Amino acid sequence: MKLTAISGGAVFLSGLTRLSHAASGNGAAAGYNEAPAQTKSSVRAEDRVFITNEDSNTLTVIDPRTNTVESTINLTSFDEDARPPFRFVTAGVAPTHAAMIHKPLYHGCIDAHGAVPSPDGKLLATSGRGSSNIYLIDAVNKRVIGNIPNPSSGPTTNPERLTSGILVGREPHEPTFTRNGKELWVTLRGEDRIAILDVARAVKQVGGTDADAILRYVPTINGPAQAWFNAQGTIAFVASQKTSKVDVFSVNADKSGHSHPERIITLDISAQDKPGFTPFLKTSPDGNEVWFSHKLSDAVSCRATSGTFDILDTVPLGNLARPNHVEFVQNAKGKVVYASLARVDDGGPDGVASSQIAIIDRSVKTGTRKVVSTFFTHAREAHGLWTNPENDLLYVAHEQDELPGTPNAGQTVCTVFDVSDPLNPQFITHIPLGSLKLPSGELRNKKSINLVYVRPGYRGQTA
């Protein structure tokens, strides 16, 4: 992909419109040790950022007051027993991330991937793609719900034994809570159905009670990637990574708040996504739009959330941009949607290769939206991103490790931006994710996927 440098140090995708919103923190001249631009006065003591790490099967917990790693939540089963087959490090040798899940007697998570907060921010659901299950996380106490005391606990073993979570089906990609928090919808990307769980029962079941947490399976399009709900919680949109379609369901909640889904329509989105590979979607804060990330089409699109769900905008992102998640930021200085781009570009800050985020101005008339600017994420293969409730901070997760010769060489990092001016983001810092310290050795946190900013007790983005 050809890059073009412009005044102000910003670098934009060839063929995209240039605007004069180039920030000194965005371009090739921007340093890694740039002073923080955000006072962080909006951050509260209870705020935390959670990141799923797919290769290490861990969740990183970041304290946004200090932008440092507070803890790592363990979804592996290593070191529950002192005997060699149960250990992470055996005879002084640590396995590779790819090999560790094949060790004998491993019963932990495989491919920790999706993560989403409950409407009140007190609960997280995360999916194990390879282990075909869902785990529930207490977001207040930062612990896995359902773990039990380890009968083999001791100086060289873990104090807890990992729960099995809830087995739901093949390739659970993304879990999503209904707006009332009563249910969890899990898209089974390896199948053609959605698992719908009762949240209260699920909390009991992960602790070992046979609570029949799975209420039903709903047939849908092949390869469902993610479900998301309109603002009222009455309509669900389901995207696919195997077909150029979007399923739209009426939730039909009963008096108890539980759903009885009925398909309204299956939309043909081949004009926007001919390859049929749409991994993520999200509704706008005003509830009027739903935005889709078409990864292999290198585009995002927007549809109305009511009526006949008409297409409102299709926004190309450039050759091989490979968009992942979208996120909305709206405050006194602007109204945008960001799209994280997996592609890694040369010529990033300090000359180091970096991914970028596309900025789309949502304040303009529908049908005219386009990329107005991009900014470097200061790390490689951007994936999950989430803003804080005040919409003045943005956290970005990355899949690839940092390159040799860089300040955080060999580490997976999260990066932080001041987005108090959404059209002019300012880089704040890198956060190296470090390691999970197991009794037998350190397991490095690796390959970050989803990221969520959580304020327990606050009605968040899923409310």
Regions found by a protein language model. Give the residues of each.
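Short, conserved, GDST-rich strand-edge loop motifs in beta-rich repeat architectures
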Residues: 36-43, 340-353, 397-413
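Beta-propeller fold detector
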Residues: 70-86, 145-152, 156-160, 206-219, ...
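Short loop/turn segments immediately following beta-strands, especially the blade-tip
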Residues: 66, 140-143, 198-207, 249-258, ...
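Beta-rich, blade/repeat-based domains predominating
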Residues: 28-45, 78-119, 151-179, 219-232, ...
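N-terminal export signals
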Residues: 1-20
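Solenoidal tandem-repeat scaffolds enriched in leucines and small polar residues
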Residues: 182-303, 311
